[in-house]
Amino acid sequence: MAYRNRNLASQTQRPLAPTAPRRRPVVTPQISDRSRLRGFANVGSGPCHPLTDRAANQHLQTYEANVKGSFELIVPFLKRISALQHDQDFVSKCQSLARSELGFDLPSHLLEQAWVRALDMRALFAWCVFQSHQHVSDHFFQEDPLQGGEGSIQAKHFQSFLVDCGFHLLDVSPCADGRLAHTIAYALRIPFSSVRRRSHAGALFDVEKTVNRWIKTEHRRYREGVPNSADSPTRYLKVVTYHFSSLDPSHQGCAAHGSDDALAASAGQQRLLDFRESVENSFCCGASVDLLLIGLDTDTDAIRVHVPAADGSIVLDEWLSAEDLYHETLSLTSDEAMQHIAERVEAIAPKKPDEGMVAFIVKLIANNFSQIDYVKQSHAGPYPDAGHAERFIGVGIGFKEVHLRNLTYFAHLDTVEVGAPDLDVGVKIFKGLNVSRDLPIPVVVRFDYSGQVPGARDRAVTDCYRVNQAIAERYSELFDQGLLHTFLTIRDRDKKDTSEVVGSSLEPVHQEAH
């Protein structure tokens, strides 16, 4: 296959610019309202809970429908051009259709082979997924469609609220399952820039790396007074979000824990306790952190909160269900509902809870009511896609722009060797989603870097190619059959710019002269 480029890792000394089209499109894909909103009912109509934010629901639905609608256009488009590949003016006709319907060009070297061999639809499918993701990424960083970027009104208000609750930083680790990718912006309704998010299979975050991030946070408080001064009586709040299925608990729960809800919760709690113990053992003067364990029902997006006592203790088999509270407060006024939630939070804690933690949990539950209504009104009940329906795997460090359910399976890692368990789960999921339909697994590799550090960009590029080579070797059978494609990107986290493409397995392989 002429387009296969397995040895990208050996080319890190060159500029690494793919020869396939990379310019940002100037044509916006024409997605009809029907295509955009397929599967979505209007969330602006129908009865809601008094605490539900109707305007926010409408805004979030429009964003989700537009993004997912762009991915849904891919297969119908490819079916159309498949029927045209023997036309005399196929290449020009195909590119014109691609620009008008998808908003980007297709790789010319793949189209130009159509007269001598069948179109490589696997490669074209992967390319369309990658470019659609780039559209989403560009729009996210340039326009802040979720209105939660750094400096936004929502982010400022939430940070002020967080400090009032007694916390200076919120660090959340959801499961890497794509059904939790929307945890922050949708399920919890928190501005994305106000949260440090790292997803891991089973929500089993790396304790050592989290301790290092805690150290950097406390050091910055001491040196710069950001987000507040080191002498302020606030704490670092670490949250684990595991997941479960209320409709099919034995099959649609967390794959990393064998769909065992109790195991998912206990493993998350243990990882939290290990983190706190590591901080307390390593630093003196009462250094510690606050912990919170949350479960998310992937069928309804309702959360359940294991309310901790002031000393951090929780009872694993006791939690507060947002779904239950939603129904308990449905006939109350908004003020009465908030009061009822607060009373229930305090009552279920094993011992007297911290006042700031109570206020924080009350807000999360109240926010979650909007998401409960969002799911009910968008889909007339639970999500129709109870299982996995992700569009691509995201590998590496980054993906700040992904905040939609079932869009991306995350595998946050520095090396494939260390992150193999997360990545293996993702590949297994996509064997069922894509390979079973003879479609490839699209893998976007991303490494964010700090542009303020000399040489950081070059190291990020090297990391991309190193991980790409490791993926090609670990999944060589899929890779060699064109059933796994990679797209390499980097991004300067110190800027609001979008990601930069530095390579792809879809680049043409140039034959050496003899």
Curated annotation (Swiss-Prot):
Q: Does the keyword Cell inner membrane apply?
A: no
Its catalytic activity? hydrogencarbonate + H(+) = CO2 + H2O
What are the protein's UniProt keywords?
Bacterial microcompartment, Carbon dioxide fixation, Carboxysome, Lyase, Metal-binding, Photosynthesis, Zinc
Query: Where does the UniProt annotation locate this protein?
Result: Carboxysome
InterPro entries annotated for this entry?
A: Carboxysome_shell_carb_anhy (IPR014074), CsoSCA_C (IPR048620), CsoSCA_C_sf (IPR043066), CsoSCA_cat (IPR048539), CsoSCA_N (IPR048619), CsoSCA_N_sf (IPR043065)
From which domain of life does this come?
Bacteria
Task: Indicate whether Lyase appears among the record's keywords.
Answer: yes
What's any GO biological process attached to this entry? carbon fixation
- Give, as one word, the top-level EC class: lyase
- Annotated coiled-coil segments of the chain: none
| EC numbers on record | 4.2.1.1
Q: Which GO terms describe its cellular component?
A: carboxysome
Disordered as annotated region, ranges = 1-27
Q: How is the cofactor bound?
A: Binds 1 Zn(2+) per monomer.
Query: What does this chain do?
Result: Reversible hydration of carbon dioxide. Essential for photosynthetic carbon dioxide fixation, supplies CO(2) to RuBisCO (ribulose bisphosphate carboxylase, cbbL-cbbS) in the carboxysome.
Provide the family line: Belongs to the beta-class carbonic anhydrase family. CsoSCA subfamily.
What does the subunit comment say? Answer: Homodimer.
- NCBIfam families linked to this entry: shell_carb_anhy (TIGR02701)
Instruction: Specify the protein name.
Output: Carboxysome shell carbonic anhydrase
Q: Which organism is it from?
A: Prochlorococcus marinus (strain MIT 9313)
Q: What is the lineage of its organism?
A: Bacteria, Bacillati, Cyanobacteriota, Cyanophyceae, Synechococcales
Please name the gene that encodes this protein. csoS3
